[in-house]
Amino acid sequence: MKVYKDLYSNDEVCSDAYDHHDPFDNADLSSVAFEVKTSKVPKGEEDYGIGYNDEEGADQMNVDPNVEMVVDVVDKFGLQSLSLTKKDYSSYIRKYIQRLVATLQEKNPERVEPFKTTVSDFVKHVLANFEDFEFYVGESLDYEAGLVYAYYKGEEVSPRLVFLKDGLVEERY
């Protein structure tokens, strides 16, 4: 199993247990980011998907209305919600990309130009749809580390989470 950790905070933020998709259904951005589909699950009740196997599907799962429902990836990895204004995000992402570029120049110089080109399209998409996003950081609440981008696709009841690949370290267990 692979676990993805933030490059700077070392917080675990995702794993390969969740299928990776093109971010925002845009294959051009897949060189810099990946997206995972999440599920809402009852907090503290781990049935490992057994409750989803009935004929009516997950929507008909009997859940006590007093039980708190959480987003599986957010809960499992202890992601913390972060409130940002568009101005705050613009300032943050400028500094974060500079930091990532410096790291790439040191460790993987041939990756710098393709990263800079594609990540600018990623940021443009986020800024153009800013109201649709929620943001998370890792468990350590390191605000200089990478962000996790959450948005709702269509009528889905659980958010999709998007991660910048170059801000992650892959660890095998």
From Swiss-Prot:
Residue ranges constituting the TCTP domain according to the UniProt record: 1-173
| A GO CC term assigned to this protein in UniProt | cytoplasm
User: Localized where?
Assistant: Cytoplasm
Molecular functions per Gene Ontology:
calcium ion binding
Q: Which PROSITE patterns match?
A: TCTP_2, TCTP_3
Coiled coil spans: none
Keywords carried by this UniProt record: Calcium, Cytoplasm
Q: Which family does it belong to?
A: Belongs to the TCTP family.
Q: Its biological function?
A: Involved in calcium binding and microtubule stabilization.
Q: What is this protein called?
A: Translationally-controlled tumor protein homolog
